[in-house]
Amino acid sequence: FSTDKGRKTLISGLRRAGKYRSLIARVLDEEGVPQELIHLAQAESGFLPRAVSRKAATGMWQFVQARGREYGLMQSSYHDDRLDPEKATRAAARHLRDLYNEFGDWYLAIAAYNCGPGGVERAVQRTGYADFWELYKRNVLPKETRNYVPIILAMTIMVKNARDYDLEDIDPDPPLEYDSLEMSAVTNLALIADITDQPVSLIRELNPALLKTVAPAGYELRIPKGSTSFVAAALDLIPGSK
């Protein structure tokens, strides 16, 4: 983070985190994992819900398809739950908790989140050390993973000591607030935008998991907070929406 590019990336991510910080903190608490794990979302995606890596890892927490399905992140032609900040955060928290239960150490759990549990298992078996720093010294983990855990620790220290790192003046984006309403029929997002007098871009931002400009029947659509009653009433007046 000492380079201009690295610092700009960190600051933009911390600013964007304001939209999701309270949500992530709540889910991590509910799943019983340390709050510091929020910094994995910064390292993985910079808190971008629609981030996609060169290896097709997707979403804020960068799940590949198989791992996502393992933790209940469903995909269809209409939506991809890996792009849903709340669902993906819960899946990531549960995955990290499982990794901790497997390795008995949060540093190893974080390393396994990056390179997969098999990579950490092989490193432990090869050296006889179930300790990240011993594995680090022996250079038996992938280079990316050897750097990954220190990056998470560095971000944790920097955020907790924001003044010491000239980060105290970052103005975070306001949190995204919303209600949810189940759609009884295929519903165009532009219609919801018209009903709520909000831009379509906001409706899409509230629903990053949607791959199209419509929500399928049965989908729990996120709508601007406080709009549930009049959105429901307006949809009831539209033929075919019941």
Give residue spans per PLM region.
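Alpha-helical scaffolds flanking conserved acidic
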Residues: P34-A41, T58, W106-A111
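Short, surface-exposed glycine/acidic/tryptophan-bearing loops
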Residues: A51-G72
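Extracytoplasmic and endomembrane cell-envelope/extracellular-matrix remodeling and assembly machinery
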Residues: F1-R26, E30-E31, E70, Q75-E102, ...
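A structure-centric signal for secondary-structure junctions around beta-strands
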Residues: L37, A57-T58, V149, G218
